[in-house]
UniProtKB/Swiss-Prot annotation:
It comes from the Bacteria. Keywords: Methylation, Ribonucleoprotein, Ribosomal protein, RNA-binding, rRNA-binding. Pfam families: Ribosomal_L3. The lineage of its organism: Bacteria, Pseudomonadati, Pseudomonadota, Gammaproteobacteria, Pseudomonadales. GO terms for cellular component: cytosolic large ribosomal subunit. One of its GO terms (molecular function) is rRNA binding. This is Large ribosomal subunit protein uL3. One of the primary rRNA binding proteins, it binds directly near the 3'-end of the 23S rRNA, where it nucleates assembly of the 50S subunit. The modification N5-methylglutamine is found at residue 150. Belongs to the universal ribosomal protein uL3 family. GO terms for biological process: translation. It comes from Pseudomonas aeruginosa (strain ATCC 15692 / DSM 22644 / CIP 104116 / JCM 14847 / LMG 12228 / 1C / PRS 101 / PAO1). Part of the 50S ribosomal subunit. Forms a cluster with proteins L14 and L19. Methylated by PrmB. The gene is rplC.
């Protein structure tokens, strides 16, 4: 089963076991995911379910999107996401909730990492800085040489240099679900997940067996 849910990162806290052990957890709010389209091999070439979550003002929905949501008879959400399916059956208008998961289950969480803007090599690639003294004047944080001379006469592709850091899709694998709160639509996942508070995250059953 590869189907998951789309949630919103609420932040981190901690909970205590009966033995008094502190467990750091990330709270993910999973509003009911509404199915907007069910794709089949006959019509689309593969089996998948398309969902939306949250709400969006009507003035922020294009006519094409409004028609797509109206056809499925669901309220417009803040986006659409797709999950490949095995033998599961869904129909437009169905809802997928946190009941899909249970405590102790391992999941993969995908989100967009925090954007850091333009960053140097020390922040971006963990380069070590150069000497603060001993004749070094203005090169304390420079990366140093980026290649050779006439041969090969170019900088190799993939060279670690300064550039944009963050704001990219990141997946953290094999996190444990500590608690499922179906009444408040919350998932408590052990550890940290990518992205800023309030960002969208995708929670799927873990692809790899732990250990």
């Amino acid at each position: 089963m590869t189907i998951g849910v789309v949630g919103r990162k609420c932040g981190m806290t901690r909970i205590f076991t009966e033995e008094g052990v502190s467990i750091p957890v990330t709270v993910i709010e999973v509003e009911p995911n509404r199915v907007t389209q069910f794709k089949t091999e006959e019509t689309d070439g593969y089996r998948a379910v398309q969902v939306t979550a949250g709400e969006r003002r009507a003035s922020r929905v294009t006519k094409a999107q409004a028609g797509h949501f109206a056809k499925a008879n669901v309220a417009a959400g803040r986006g659409v996401w797709e999950f490949r399916l095995g033998e599961e059956q869904y129909a437009a208008g169905d809802q997928i909730t946190v009941d899909l998961f249970q405590a102790g289950q391992m999941v993969d969480v995908t989100g967009e990492s925090k954007g850091k803007g333009f960053a140097g090599t020390i922040k971006r690639w963990n380069f070590r800085g150069q000497d603060n003294t001993h004749g070094n004047s203005v090169s304390h944080r420079v990366p140093g040489s980026i290649g050779q001379c006439q041969t090969p006469g170019r900088v190799f592709k993939g060279k670690k240099m300064s550039g944009h850091l963050g704001a990219e899709r990141v997946t953290v694998q094999s996190l444990e679900i500590v608690r499922v709160d179906a009444e408040r639509n919350l998932l408590l996942v052990k550890g940290a997940v990518p992205g800023a508070t309030g960002g969208d995250v995708i929670v799927r059953p873990a692809a790899k067996a732990r250990g």
